[in-house]
Amino acid sequence: MAAVQIDDYGPWTTEPAPRRETDLQALQARLFADVADFLGGRDGYAFAGRFDNMVGAATGIAPAAFERLQERIRNRYPVTVSVGIGTARTPADALDAAGTALRDAGSAQDENRQEALSHRSPPGFAGTPGAVTIAHFDVVDATGTYTDTVSPVRAGTEIQGAVTTLAEYLYDTHDAVTQFVGGDNAIAVCPEIDAGIVDDATAHVREAAGVDFQVGVGHGDTPHDAGADAKHALETCRATGARVHGPWTTADD
């Protein structure tokens, strides 16, 4: 997993005077697009996160390759980025290690930290990145239940609240990293999971937030491979009415 952080961004947004919010939003959107292109071009996944702090699923991408991303950002924007990369047994542990790598390089608002690039693993971990599992969550009938029925504010708070509930549950119980990816969709980078784990997660969200998810799960050597399988599995859910479909499902199910 990778953590991509804009260097000294908070002070930059206010010096020498506070910058226009729309300009900052446009900068963040363009910068994230470059991060997504970089990771996607190498079969990874990118998530906007908080925009000044982005997340990547980077299995199969050499840490040194991120120097190219840093060069691209430096040449195109008035800011730079630092990158922490973590390798661990689970996505949550890997992202925690990536965050540690960034913090060890200096504060997010340290004017002397620029384009840091560091790779970490948890103490005692000596393995290599394994296969990737992606779960793609989609709200059942979001258009009929929310988009065409309630105000945009209500639709947004209901869906994003459900994603937050899902993300906290999967992080706390299964060491997965879940991100909202727009519309009514969320993607979770998971340890290897089974249908029972997914059913428990969706049941928890249904009870806690009142939102019903359908889920496609994929498995592959890279985030792209696993994500593509997950999207195809999700289409099977939409076509059949199943709530969960994944690599454990037989062709006759």
Curated annotation (Swiss-Prot):
Keyword field contains Cell membrane: no
Membrane spanning residue stretches: none
Keywords from the UniProt entry: GTP-binding, Hydrolase, Nucleotide-binding
Region of interest called Disordered, as start-end residue ranges on this chain: 102-125
EC numbers: 3.5.4.29
Keyword Nucleotide-binding: yes
GO terms assigned for molecular function: GTP binding; GTP cyclohydrolase IIa activity
GO biological process: biosynthetic process
Catalysed reactions listed for this entry: GTP + 3 H2O = 2-amino-5-formylamino-6-(5-phospho-D-ribosylamino)pyrimidin-4(3H)-one + 2 phosphate + 2 H(+)
Function noted in UniProt: Catalyzes the formation of 2-amino-5-formylamino-6-ribofuranosylamino-4(3H)-pyrimidinone ribonucleotide monophosphate and inorganic phosphate from GTP. Also has an independent pyrophosphate phosphohydrolase activity.
Entry's family note: Belongs to the archaeal-type GTP cyclohydrolase family.
Designated name of the protein: GTP cyclohydrolase III 2
Lineage, broadest ranks: Archaea, Methanobacteriati, Methanobacteriota, Stenosarchaea group, Halobacteria
Gene that encodes it: gch32
